[in-house]
Swiss-Prot record:
Changes after translation: Contains 5 disulfide bonds.
One GO cellular component, as annotated: extracellular region
Keyword Disulfide bond on entry: yes
Domain comment, as recorded: The cysteine framework is VIII (C-C-C-C-C-C-C-C-C-C).
Function description: Acts as a neurotoxin.
Main location (coarse class): secreted
Domain of life from the UniProt record: Eukaryota
Keywords: Cleavage on pair of basic residues, Disulfide bond, Neurotoxin, Secreted, Signal, Toxin
Protein's recorded name: Putative conotoxin
Organism: Conus caracteristicus
Length: 107
């Protein structure tokens, strides 16, 4: 019985740790088009479905850990997202994104 309780505590701690780390990086993309990691822990918001966290790129919706307004504006010479579409680096001032040569750029 003691072994079972110990294992249950360890399992609970591990799963809590994983959830807490899910959004340690505020640039992380939580979900895209309703798929992906819906376990992002965002304080005070439903970051995996809240429009304040949403970026639309070529008909696909990406939701980030922090609100889009919290990102700095892209300067035009840098990548907007990483190649795997898993992190947003900056936001486009006009809020319009597109894909050019396989990369996300401001439209």
């Amino acid at each position: 019985m003691k072994l079972f309780m110990f294992a249950a505590i360890i399992f609970t701690m591990a799963s809590t740790t994983v959830r807490a780390e899910q959004c340690a990086n505020n640039r992380k993309v939580c979900t895209w088009d309703g798929q992906g990691d819906t376990n992002c822990d965002c304080i005070g918001t439903a970051c995996h479905e809240d429009d304040a966290h949403k970026v639309s790129v070529a008909g696909s919706a990406f939701y980030t850990c922090q609100p889009i307004s919290a990102f700095r504006v892209c300067d035009g010479s840098e990548d907007v997202m990483d190649a795997g579409f898993s992190e947003l680096y900056c936001r486009c001032s006009g809020g319009s994104y597109t894909i050019s040569n396989g990369e996300v750029v401001c439209d």
